[in-house]
């Protein structure tokens, strides 16, 4: 079977969804600029070799509708001979794009793919036009479509306290701020045009969403937002609403080597798994277990881990049940996570994978895991191996 590898991976800065730096920039533009950037950064690659553009996006309507993958690839000047498809596995969409490209490569159905994802949550709100089937309540808990309440349920089931959640959120902001100040995001961020608070055109080079001033004291003053009477989950311990895109160049290994392109990581294994929709945030546990089994590995073999921080109340039970409580500081979300950076839904899978690969290089690590929960009860996981 052929081997799929990551040749390059980048992302936009993360912009705030409310009056943020990308308020006048469309989702197609964020996407197209990254597609162009991959070609600029890898001049050995003839664009005519691209088999397909596979792009994750959850809210496929308004500017993100009508196959945003194709719209963005045409904007980017990708040859018209390349295909383009938009995929939707909710929060796991752009990680699913990685998996789709890898499966195609492994089965000989192409050797060069641009993948990624986008979500402009400022322009297309996450609940825009959502209309659940009334009969769904006969199969799953009525609150299963309300992500914050599923986090509340998972946190209660695992005894996660408000203080534990607040501490996890503070860590996320502190780590992300330190990564910014120390230049550790520089290799993964592709600067984009945006607008400052006064409307002036600027080059955006850093994430806008991080709040370095976050403390236990400031978070303690926030009220529970999803279950005001009995809850513990606040806006401060939930992933921020943000606008952003991420992208990767995924190739068949021998093809990349023949072109003299760098190989930053191999895709060692992949998995998706389902769980109860009422505790959708638990999905990373079965997905990770499945991916590790397919790779012949255990959690002890993992050097670096990116676990998408949808909610602190969701992340901490996953850490616990994967047996990772003792290695959080050494291995998990070392540059912060979605609580600090935001979770632009269709973007996040390739975003956390990009951050992971850069961390693996920085730490000289061999095996890394990127995993995330998915609304309505799924998880997705990818094991990467540095060459």
Curated annotation (Swiss-Prot):
Cysteines joined through disulfide linkages: none
UniProt cross-references to Gene3D superfamilies, sorted A to Z: 3.40.47.10
GO cellular component, one term: cytoplasm
Family that this chain belongs to: Belongs to the thiolase-like superfamily. Thiolase family.
Name of the protein described by the UniProt record: 3-ketoacyl-CoA thiolase
Reaction catalyzed: an acyl-CoA + acetyl-CoA = a 3-oxoacyl-CoA + CoA
Active site per UniProt: 91 (acyl-thioester intermediate), 343 (proton acceptor), 373 (proton acceptor)
Entry keyword set: Acyltransferase, Cytoplasm, Fatty acid metabolism, Lipid degradation, Lipid metabolism, Transferase
Top EC group: transferase
Role, per record: Catalyzes the final step of fatty acid oxidation in which acetyl-CoA is released and the CoA ester of a fatty acid two carbons shorter is formed.
GO terms under biological process: fatty acid beta-oxidation; phenylacetate catabolic process
